[in-house]
Amino acid sequence: MRIEAAELRILELPLKFRFETSFGVQTKRTILLLRLFGEGLEGLGEGVMERLPLYREETVAGARYLLEEVFLPRVLGRDLPNPEALREALAPFRGNPMAKAVLEMAFFDLWAKALGRPLWQVLGGVRQAVEVGVSLGIQPSVEDTLRVVERHLEEGYRRIKLKIKPGWDYEVLKAVREAFPEATLTADANSAYSLANLAQLKRLDELRLDYIEQPLAYDDLLDHAKLQRELSTPICLDESLTGAEKARKAIELGAGRVFNVKPARLGGHGESLRVHALAESAGIPLWMGGMLEAGVGRAHNLHLATLPGFTKPGDVSSASRYWEEDIVEEALEAKDGLMPVPEGVGIGVHLKLPFVERVTLWQRYMSAS
């Protein structure tokens, strides 16, 4: 597979609602969109890094520089027979998994199309629909939270995840648990706590949470292992997992009993497959996380979530929850708590180019010649 050309864009999409977490508020999403061209085909990748390094260290500006000045010049015009060859081409460059993932996932789409197969089959998936839940940002009040939770349960979502932080945790989770005693309920702290908050976190054991996600520092494993020994509630690791090596160490330390997989955070599908294999061998359940993706990233996530190790409902909920209009033609919508995987070869979605043009802030076309 020879990569003949690439088009890189920065898009800005307004969210339909204010999304608050422990580290800030989002009302719009900046998206890095990559189109790869080769052998008459097009592969699509989407970057989910943010303008500021609030989730992980990587940013839109940094990823744009690496793709435009380093990664794409290194692969344009090269014959890359498979994604492993692309991985080897990028291996000299340390870190930056989110920037690498944009290129790698676009290449996976291109490669699957060249094979004439849907991506989920190429990855080893076993289903054509994925169980999904919703991730709810911090609401203005407990009463508002209860109303939003009730609406999403009525829509059929199979898991409710609430964002929490010190001062917005036990009481809101207790209210939801009492109102919906049979709901699958989880909490996501986005690194808002430390071991000094042990007493607060132990109180959450009363609430029958399916797990508490990333309670401690974004790059930590050791303290999560200490905390897990104190809690009956499983800890789910998110930000701390940046690749298969970190996953291996997390398993050895006992730092978490559940893993959140985000291919964009891990460096793409290849590294996600390696994490999947480690987790399966250790008996650790996986679920597909979300980063407020538009249609390209959402489609990639759905294809990966068809692998057998993904046994818990993920965050890949309906696109219409987030956007008045998406960047792809296909409607990616859940029904009765299930998201169908897009049909067709590759990731199975096509850009809605007139809309993409309207929301483009910057673009550059690069060719091998």
Curated annotation (Swiss-Prot):
Q: Which residues bind Mg(2+)?
A: 188, 213, 238
Q: Which residues form the signal peptide?
A: none
- EC numbers for this chain: 5.1.1.-, 4.2.1.113
- Give the cofactor binding note: Binds 1 divalent metal cation per subunit.
Q: Which InterPro entries match?
A: Enolase-like_C_sf, Enolase-like_N, Enolase_C-like, Mandelate_racemase_C, Mandelate_racemase_N_dom, OSBS/NAAAR
Q: Does the keyword Lyase apply?
A: yes
Q: Does the keyword Magnesium apply?
A: yes
The biological processes this protein is annotated with in GO are: menaquinone biosynthetic process
> One GO MF term, please?
O-succinylbenzoate synthase activity
Q: Which UniProt keywords apply?
A: Isomerase, Lyase, Magnesium, Metal-binding
Q: Active site annotated at which positions? A: 163, 262
Instruction: Check the record and name the SUPFAM superfamilies matching this protein.
Output: Enolase C-terminal domain-like, Enolase N-terminal domain-like
Reactions this protein catalyses: (1R,6R)-6-hydroxy-2-succinyl-cyclohexa-2,4-diene-1-carboxylate = 2-succinylbenzoate + H2O
SMART domains named among the record's database cross-references: MR_MLE
Provide the cofactor list for this protein.
a divalent metal cation
Under the subunit heading, UniProt states: Homooctamer. Tetramer of dimers.
Give the record's family classification: Belongs to the mandelate racemase/muconate lactonizing enzyme family. MenC type 2 subfamily.
- What does the protein in this record do? Acts as a N-succinylamino acid racemase (NSAR) that catalyzes the racemization of N-succinyl-L-phenylglycine. Also converts 2-succinyl-6-hydroxy-2,4-cyclohexadiene-1-carboxylate (SHCHC) to 2-succinylbenzoate (OSB). Catalyzes both N-succinylamino acid racemization and OSB synthesis at equivalent rates. However, NSAR activity is probably the protein's biological function, because menaquinone biosynthesis genes are missing in this species.
**What's the protein here called?**
N-succinylamino acid racemase
What organism does the UniProt record list as the source?
Thermus thermophilus (strain ATCC 27634 / DSM 579 / HB8)
Please name the taxonomic classification of the source. Answer: Bacteria, Thermotogati, Deinococcota, Deinococci, Thermales
